[in-house]
Amino acid sequence: MRMFVQDAGELDALRAAAKTTVTALLAGMHAIRPGVQQRIVESVVESACWNSGAHGTDFWPWSMSGENTVFPRDFFSLALYDHLNKEMRAGELVRLDVGCEWQHYQGDLGRTVPVSGHYTDDQRETWNIFVAAYHAGAAVLRAGVTVDQAYEVWRSELLRHRATAKSALAQHAIDSWSKRENVPFWQIHATNLLAARPPAMLPAGMTVNFEPIASVDGQGFFLEDMYLITKEGAELLTPGVPYSAEQIEEEMLHASRP
């Protein structure tokens, strides 16, 4: 259990890693636009980590777009030579998943971002439902809760939107993601020196990442934040990053584009 629970010094390092990671993710978000190369966005993230005082990235940034956001192509995009770079195109979504390293401790944070700066109507509805489910799941995180319990709350919130979902994409997403076997990479993982599978019940004092990963109709949806588990709940360690489609569009609209 000790490997999962951080002492005060370790938590200070994780807080610093989280803070610099927020800066790096926003920098990456601001660099995304039609025609930009995946590698350019990744280099912006790497530079932002260093410029904010971190020791670079703790893993190579993920900024896959389009079909490369869907398993297994997202992993291929990291590992195979013919998928290592791609020009981003309007209408695509980007999986932006980044982390800065501070004194060997990991930051880890992510959002799903529209290349054009605007979601399509069906992407917007689907993403906002995904976000609502995320917030519901995050709200139950506390000491003693299991990963399966958090998933069931997330799932229940998805299903609550089924009757009012308007687009075929959102309806298909809810029907698919509400079956556990269709979201095999939906996860909560421990974060400190390395990412790791958490114990059966989350202990107080552990830093975790809440990271639902899902896809539907060739589009990936991904959201991730860092939390400190306490007896009363979970403290968000990565505040300051927009969630909803409208908030993300506003952030991208007012970004100073390179």
Regions found by a protein language model. Name each.
Residues M1-P258:
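Active-site neighborhoods and metal-handling regions in enzymes and metal-associated proteins
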